[in-house]
Design a protein with these regions (language model features):
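Alpha-helix N-cap/helix-initiation sites
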Residues: 17, 39, 52-56
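Aromatic side chains
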Residues: 14, 24-25, 62
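Surface-exposed, Lys/Arg-rich phosphate-binding patches that contact polyanionic backbones
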Residues: 23-41, 45-48
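Short, well-ordered coil↔helix boundary/capping segments
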Residues: 18-22, 33, 53
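Glycine-rich, flexible loop/turn motifs
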Residues: 5-7, 42, 51
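Short Lys/Arg-rich basic patches
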Residues: 1-19
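C-terminal structural segments of small proteins and small subunits
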Residues: 48-69
Length: 69
């Protein structure tokens, strides 16, 4: 795994900075493409269902679940 890469996404009208390993960004990009949504829309979907879990952790878990892990 590489070092963290930050991206800024707009969630519910607010710019949010999210730091993930490049491998997780690549996985989320693939998922967004498969679902025909933007990366921001995908992360918004993850954000809504994450509960108390930090957003970065929720994104990693989501990517692993979608990968079958």
């Amino acid at each position: 795994m590489g070092s963290l890469k930050k991206r800024s996404v707009n969630l519910a009208g607010h710019a949010t900075s999210l730091a993930l390993e490049p491998e997780f960004w690549a996985a989320l990009d693939r998922i967004a493409k498969q679902d025909a949504v933007s990366i921001a829309a995908l992360i918004q979907r993850i954000d809504v269902g994450r509960g108390e879990r930090p957003l970065a952790s929720a994104c990693r878990v989501y990517a692993l679940q979608r990968a079958g892990g």
